[in-house]
Amino acid sequence: MSLSNAPLGQHVAYPSQYDPGLLFPIPRATNRASLQLGATLPFTGVDLWNAYELSWLDARGKPRVAMATFSFPADSPNIVESKSFKLYLNSFNQTRLPNAQALRDRLERDLAAAAGAPVGLEFISPQRFGELNMAELDGIYIDKLDIEIDTYEPAPQLLQCAPGDEVEETLATRLLKSNCPVTGQPDWASLQVRYRGRPIDRAALLKYVVSFRQHAEFHEHCVERIFGDIMRACQPRQLTVYARYTRRGGLDINPWRSNFESAPPADVRTARQ
């Protein structure tokens, strides 16, 4: 499907009844071709989506609410366009269902069909809301480094290694900003880079992250671009790139890519989420 047909950036009426046809898949392969990624990916990964505005009607018409975390595997053929996902979830608002399991079943079925692969789902009932925590990404934050930069489109040539023996460390920043490729709206994120290899020059990494500031690309694609650029520039033996983007339309998106870890860390939202 062409992005010109996506609901993002268009005036779309909110649905009054359940409609799985609202989901708009976007092939991952299109963007990956521009990153020189083929069928064999250099990473494993997952896109964690947190839904904060999930509601439906029970069999007697009483509203119910919940939260949910969806896990889209990075090797699924498609991502789901975010506004279409929001509209789809809102289509349950006036839909009567016999129980929460009926909602789960529809969500799992519809999202798997859109993504082209099974999608993990954790359902969070109101009884568990008090258990949810906030935390910042682990790592050494590089935001206070004194840098000067006037480049605001991705500039992988800024990346460089520092002298020294191989290290194993985790670096983090809250200064990642990219933009929606359809609407131009800003997308804000915290970024974590965990690696083992030659030391990455921290000031160079911060400049590189800041260079995304006027770049227009979906969250998932930005993280894969960052992963590839770091691999080419510094060739770490192990690398994980993880971004937690701020919420929009009741959804936040948190792409995670790694060539050595089997699963992302606990899905704990940051203060800005």
Swiss-Prot record:
The record, for Pfam families, names: QueF, QueF_N
Question: Cellular component GO terms, alphabetically?
Answer: cytoplasm
Enzyme Commission code: 1.7.1.13
Which positions bind substrate?
V80, E81, S82, H219, E220
Q: Where does NADPH bind?
A: S82, K83, R248, G249
Where does this protein act, in terms of pathway? tRNA modification; tRNA-queuosine biosynthesis
- Primary enzyme class: oxidoreductase
Indicate where this protein resides in the cell. Cytoplasm
One biological-process term from Gene Ontology?
tRNA modification
What PANTHER family does the annotation carry?
A: NADPH-DEPENDENT 7-CYANO-7-DEAZAGUANINE REDUCTASE
Subunit info?
Answer: Homodimer.
Report the protein's function: Catalyzes the NADPH-dependent reduction of 7-cyano-7-deazaguanine (preQ0) to 7-aminomethyl-7-deazaguanine (preQ1).
Q: State the similarity comment.
A: Belongs to the GTP cyclohydrolase I family. QueF type 2 subfamily.
> HAMAP family in the record, alphabetically?
QueF_type2
User: What is the designated name of this protein?
Assistant: NADPH-dependent 7-cyano-7-deazaguanine reductase
